[in-house]
Amino acid sequence: MRTRVIVNGANGKMGILACETLENHEQFEVVAKLSRQDNLGQSILDTKAQIVVDLTRADCVYENSLTIINHGARPVIGTSGLVETQINELTKLCEIKQIGGIIAPNFSLGAILMMMLATKASEYFSEVEIIEGHHQQKLDAPSGTALKTAEMIAAARKKPKNKLPLKELTPGARGGSHHDINIHSLRLPGLLARQEVLFGNIGETLSITHNSIDRRCFMPGIVLACQKVLNLTNLVYGLEHLL
């Protein structure tokens, strides 16, 4: 029997590809393709969906996640915009409901490897900044991938970065800061998704860069998440935990 999946945000570019990918996969049945005017909770009940893949917007992803969990389906969240307090609340809710779920800041396997390599490098290089770039239709900044990368680096590095006594002549010139790591966000036509993690040391720099040039690169990660989530009893933050 195929696993019943709802794709929420099915009319977007990612949603269309996700529907096509899951419909052509022998393990899954797409039982509903939802957009903003649809009732997510009622659709879960009507279709008896086991998984909801959420590919919507930053301004509604938290409420969507609550709805999915409270209606007994397993969330596979590919929408950025969740902050740490919200992730913690969703984690607690999954524990109470004993429902597995996945929040994936990035579904690209190459991007996950970039984050893992950056985490390893941070054991040796404490000076690091992140430069992320996306298309101009992405309305939140910094990206979920950049935030997750900063969190992974901060947890792994062995000493704090240097405190520089500089004055910003233009406010924000040094970018934003997350876990004491500067993040610079670009929003330009011609970009899909790009991230560079730039490390510095005396006499050298190390750059780890990943470019997504086609949304199809995210599809293997969506399939992997849907395959793994039914076996989870807790909420997992980051696809790297499933590799």
Swiss-Prot record:
Q: What class of enzyme is it?
A: oxidoreductase
Report the EC code(s) recorded for this entry: 1.17.1.8
Q: Where in the cell is it found?
A: Cytoplasm
A GO cellular component term found in this entry reads: cytosol
* Pathway assigned in UniProt: Amino-acid biosynthesis; L-lysine biosynthesis via DAP pathway; (S)-tetrahydrodipicolinate from L-aspartate: step 4/4
Q: Which residues bind NAD(+)?
A: G9, A10, N11, G12, K13, M14, G78, T79, S80, A104, P105, N106, F107
- Which UniProt keywords are listed? Amino-acid biosynthesis, Cytoplasm, Diaminopimelate biosynthesis, Lysine biosynthesis, NAD, NADP, Oxidoreductase
Its UniProt entry gives the catalysed reaction(s) as:
(S)-2,3,4,5-tetrahydrodipicolinate + NAD(+) + H2O = (2S,4S)-4-hydroxy-2,3,4,5-tetrahydrodipicolinate + NADH + H(+); (S)-2,3,4,5-tetrahydrodipicolinate + NADP(+) + H2O = (2S,4S)-4-hydroxy-2,3,4,5-tetrahydrodipicolinate + NADPH + H(+)
SUPFAM superfamilies documented for this protein: Glyceraldehyde-3-phosphate dehydrogenase-like, C-terminal domain (SSF55347), NAD(P)-binding Rossmann-fold domains (SSF51735)
Q: Which GO terms describe its molecular function?
A: 4-hydroxy-tetrahydrodipicolinate reductase; NAD binding; NADP binding; oxidoreductase activity, acting on CH or CH2 groups, NAD or NADP as acceptor
- The positions annotated for binding (S)-2,3,4,5-tetrahydrodipicolinate are H135, G144, T145
Q: NADP among the record's keywords?
A: yes
Q: Entry's Pfam families?
A: DapB_C, DapB_N
Q: Which GO terms describe its biological process?
A: diaminopimelate biosynthetic process; lysine biosynthetic process via diaminopimelate
UniProt KW Cell inner membrane keyword? no
The UniProt entry annotates the active site at H134 (proton donor/acceptor), K138 (proton donor)
Q: Which PANTHER family match?
A: 4-HYDROXY-TETRAHYDRODIPICOLINATE REDUCTASE 1, CHLOROPLASTIC-RELATED (PTHR20836:SF0), DIHYDRODIPICOLINATE REDUCTASE (PTHR20836)
Q: What does this protein do?
A: Catalyzes the conversion of 4-hydroxy-tetrahydrodipicolinate (HTPA) to tetrahydrodipicolinate.
What family is this? Belongs to the DapB family.
| Name of the protein | 4-hydroxy-tetrahydrodipicolinate reductase
Q: Which gene encodes it?
A: dapB
